[in-house]
């Protein structure tokens, strides 16, 4: 059992005493129930933890007793290249950890991870595939509002996280976006049994200070202090950094996540929200700068609108469609196809417009 005692108060720069520096980003608002989703690439390195989770910040309410504890965890242990750690923690620090096997290395590429939290169950997903379902008595005690959090830190638990070497540093976790869906119990359009509907998403194009705050704290078992400089917004990503005290911040190439930092081929990622009403975003990644055309067609193959036609820079771009035709008219509800053409490749994706 991994016991983590958070020390959220009385931590100042004067008291920084840990040998390493980590980072944490958290929402200002708290949430009760919903679907919590992230697209990210975790940090490699034995002894290194990167995360996406929710936590009831009882310290900020003036409580010190762990009887108020509620937490739902997705954690990546950098020692593994084929596993993900999930956990539930309720009052008095009762936890329910589990390690799940996955078919890829989460430290090498971006994938989508999510958990659904309702009054009836908590479920964890990797690339929309269910990996864990919990509907026992833990769910009855998981009712307190929680903040969305992401952090990177160095664990002192060798048994759990593995042995650590300073030569691992610096190491980084990359976050592409976060989405929050309301739980609407069968009346939504996303998640299990359409139980959820998208409320907001953040693409990390910048630091939305009305939504997120950077944390400065630590806890027993965490060998790093969280500092503002190790939460970096760059090139459409939020990057969490684990560093030495003398090399804080992000010192890598933001466009070289694999060595190149870019996908190995031209890619059109999943459009979101999909279905949509108002505006849909179509993420595109290119290995190198090249001409790109993105057109919308209906199910009869009729041309609707050109969204992009011209030279596109290497890296990641997001192309939006507001549901208007090339003539400025509102397209009717229905199925449409986004067709993206590059120098040597054509990719088509179905999108659904609902009004």
Task: Give the role of each language-model region.
Residues 260-272, 276-355:
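C-terminal outer-membrane/trafficking sorting elements
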Residues 8-17:
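Hydrophobic h-region of N-terminal signal peptides that target proteins for export
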Residues 18-254:
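GH16 jelly-roll
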Residues 12, 58, 184, 313, ...:
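Flexible, active-site-proximal loop/turn residues at the rims of small-molecule/cofactor binding pockets
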């Amino acid at each position: 059992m991994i016991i983590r005692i958070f020390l959220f108060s009385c931590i100042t720069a004067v008291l920084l005493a840990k040998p390493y520096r980590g980072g944490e980003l958290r929402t200002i608002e708290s949430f009760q129930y919903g679907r919590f989703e992230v697209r990210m690439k975790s940090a490699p390195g034995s002894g290194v933890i990167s995360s996406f989770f929710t936590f009831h910040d009882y310290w900020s309410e003036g409580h010190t007793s762990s009887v108020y504890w509620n937490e739902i965890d997705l954690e990546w242990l950098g020692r593994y290249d084929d596993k993900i750690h999930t956990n539930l923690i309720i009052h008095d620090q009762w936890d329910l950890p589990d390690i799940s096997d996955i078919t890829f290395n989460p430290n090498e590429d971006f994938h989508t991870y999510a958990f659904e939290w309702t009054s009836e169950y908590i479920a964890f997903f990797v690339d929309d595939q269910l990996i864990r379902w919990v509907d026992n008595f833990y769910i009855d005690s998981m009712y307190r509002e929680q903040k969305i959090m992401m952090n990177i830190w160095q664990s002192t638990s060798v048994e759990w996280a593995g042995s650590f070497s300073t030569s691992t540093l610096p190491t980084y976790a990359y976050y592409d976006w976060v989405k929050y869906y309301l739980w609407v119990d069968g009346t939504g359009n996303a998640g299990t049994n359409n139980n959820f509907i998208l409320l907001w998403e953040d693409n990390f194009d910048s630091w939305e200070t009305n939504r997120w705050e950077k944390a400065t704290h630590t806890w027993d078992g965490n060998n790093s202090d969280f500092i503002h400089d190790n939460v970096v917004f760059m090139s459409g990503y939020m990057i969490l950094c684990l560093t030495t005290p003398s090399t804080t911040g992000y010192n890598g190439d933001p466009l070289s996540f694999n060595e190149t930092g870019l996908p190995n081929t031209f890619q059109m990622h999943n459009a979101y929200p999909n279905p949509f009403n108002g505006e849909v975003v179509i993420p595109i990644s290119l290995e190198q700068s090249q001409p790109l055309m993105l057109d919308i067609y209906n199910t009869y193959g009729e041309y609707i609108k050109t969204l992009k036609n011209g030279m596109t820079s290497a890296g990641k771009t997001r192309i939006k469609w507001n549901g208007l035709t090339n003539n400025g008219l509102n397209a009717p509800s229905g199925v449409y196809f986004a067709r993206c053409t590059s120098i040597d490749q054509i990719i088509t994706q179905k999108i659904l417009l609902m009004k």
